[in-house]
Amino acid sequence: MKIYYIGVLRNSDDKTLELSSVKDLSQFGFFERNSVAQFMSFFSETVAGRTSAGQRQSVEEGNYVGHVYARPEGICGVLITDKEYPVRPAYTLLNKVLDEYLVAHPPIQWKDVTESDDSLKLKELDIYIAKYQDPSQADAIMRVQQELDETKITLHKTIENVLQRGEKLDNLVDKSESLSAASRMFYKQAKKTNSCCIVM
């Protein structure tokens, strides 16, 4: 999973303008990087210009996906990723970026500009392109699911470790003095019920 580009573009006029962007070109060869960077900007301007206010869309191009979110204020966020990057974290990140951009740069600052200006950059984009390479950083639900999976793995390992010492759960149940005869019988019946069925 990889993020290659995060951009904020003005799409309220006829000419779409890239206001702030960051690119991760580390996976491309040195001589390819300039062309790839130009193509990412061109792709972003094209899809941003064709995305209506309030609309979200994901556009596939080769091995890449451009996730686009246009806001009613006249700006649009574009995230270019590989195909494996999940959609929900992509839009969560775009929403965060656009919210922060509008706080840092209200529309009055960029509505009438005709070319990119360094004063309109969002410095946090450099941090975000590194941090959100892991999509669980952008998506709380995904992060909780990952933590639950890790807990489940730990629980399975703990049970396996007890059984690896040469003790079987059946033997422990039989030897246990704290279990009543009824509890032992319940355990054995439950084990029989959960075992594979025999076809006669």
Curated annotation (Swiss-Prot):
<dbReference type="Pfam" id="PF00957">
    <property type="entry name" value="Synaptobrevin"/>
</dbReference>
<dbReference type="InterPro" id="IPR010908">
    <property type="entry name" value="Longin_dom"/>
</dbReference>
<keyword id="KW-0564">Palmitate</keyword>
<feature type="domain" description="v-SNARE coiled-coil homology">
    <location>
        <begin position="140"/>
        <end position="200"/>
    </location>
</feature>
<keyword id="KW-0175">Coiled coil</keyword>
<dbReference type="GO" id="GO:0005794">
    <property type="term" value="C:Golgi apparatus"/>
</dbReference>
<feature type="modified residue" description="Cysteine methyl ester">
    <location>
        <position position="197"/>
    </location>
</feature>
<dbReference type="GO" id="GO:0006888">
    <property type="term" value="P:endoplasmic reticulum to Golgi vesicle-mediated transport"/>
</dbReference>
<dbReference type="GO" id="GO:0005484">
    <property type="term" value="F:SNAP receptor activity"/>
</dbReference>
<keyword id="KW-0488">Methylation</keyword>
<keyword id="KW-0472">Membrane</keyword>
<feature type="propeptide" description="Removed in mature form">
    <location>
        <begin position="198"/>
        <end position="200"/>
    </location>
</feature>
<keyword id="KW-1003">Cell membrane</keyword>
<dbReference type="InterPro" id="IPR042855">
    <property type="entry name" value="V_SNARE_CC"/>
</dbReference>
<keyword id="KW-0449">Lipoprotein</keyword>
<dbReference type="Pfam" id="PF13774">
    <property type="entry name" value="Longin"/>
</dbReference>
<keyword id="KW-0636">Prenylation</keyword>
<dbReference type="InterPro" id="IPR001388">
    <property type="entry name" value="Synaptobrevin-like"/>
</dbReference>
<feature type="lipid moiety-binding region" description="S-palmitoyl cysteine">
    <location>
        <position position="196"/>
    </location>
</feature>
<dbReference type="InterPro" id="IPR045848">
    <property type="entry name" value="R-SNARE_YKT6"/>
</dbReference>
<feature type="domain" description="Longin">
    <location>
        <begin position="7"/>
        <end position="129"/>
    </location>
</feature>
<dbReference type="GO" id="GO:0005886">
    <property type="term" value="C:plasma membrane"/>
</dbReference>
<feature type="lipid moiety-binding region" description="S-farnesyl cysteine">
    <location>
        <position position="197"/>
    </location>
</feature>
<protein>
    <recommendedName>
        <fullName>Synaptobrevin homolog YKT6</fullName>
    </recommendedName>
</protein>
<dbReference type="InterPro" id="IPR011012">
    <property type="entry name" value="Longin-like_dom_sf"/>
</dbReference>
<comment type="similarity">
    <text>Belongs to the synaptobrevin family.</text>
</comment>
